[in-house]
Amino acid sequence: IIPIITMAFHFSPNGDIKRNEVNNLVKAVMNGAGLAGHHGGMCDAFRQSIDWQFLIGGQWVSHPNGITDYKVNIKNTNDPITDGIQDFDYHSEQYYMHVDPLNEVLATSKFKGNEVWKLEQEPGHPGSDTYITEWIKDVEMPVIWKRKIGKGKIFYISLGHFAKELNHPEMQTMYHRGLLWASR
């Protein structure tokens, strides 16, 4: 099962998933289905569903600086998903997430602490409050993880804001391998 849309609000105006829908998805994974996805299509989906978040192992919180340059650090070079991949530079949104400590983390990124955090405003509100995120300096954030739930497997990669990023060699290789891993 692959969530193929970018954000949950494409399903409904509020980005909701019905309880019976998420319950059926959980049952499918528990019984051996694989679930894989990337970026906001998986971890910024269904913000109101705690069961969805618990299943996939994380929830997007912010991407200070918007599109920015950062390094993806491979944490486990012995895994089939990351085999032969070295640390690499990346240009996109760097996700700050709430993540399950039970995830098997395969790659991370580190925040510099100089990112600009722009607060969301009410529609029509002029200006924007901004802050420098010095408190997240050196925070190591998972970028790729996998997990097993029941008989099923879940794979997630936070990269891929723009479709062209799917052509990035390292991202493409690990995403492809992760999809295959989750499907077996």
Say what each PLM segment does.
Residues 7-84:
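A glycine-rich, often tryptophan-bearing local segment used as a flexible ligand/cofactor-contacting loop or short
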Residues 10, 38-39, 63, 91, ...:
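Histidine (H) residue identity feature
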Residues 64-150:
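Catalytic beta-strand/loop cores that center a nucleophilic Ser/Cys/Thr
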Residues 7-8, 42-44, 110-113, 149-150, ...:
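Short, solvent-exposed loop/turn segments at secondary-structure junctions
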Residues 56, 115, 123-143, 148-184:
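Extracellular ligand-binding/catalytic regions of CAZymes and related secreted enzymes
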Residues 5, 9, 28-30, 60-64, ...:
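Glycine-rich loops and low-complexity Gly/Arg-rich segments
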Residues 41-50, 97-103, 126-132, 175, ...:
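Short flexible/disordered coil segments
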Residues 1-5, 29, 34-38, 105-107, ...:
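Structural recognition of the beta-strand scaffold that forms the well-ordered cores
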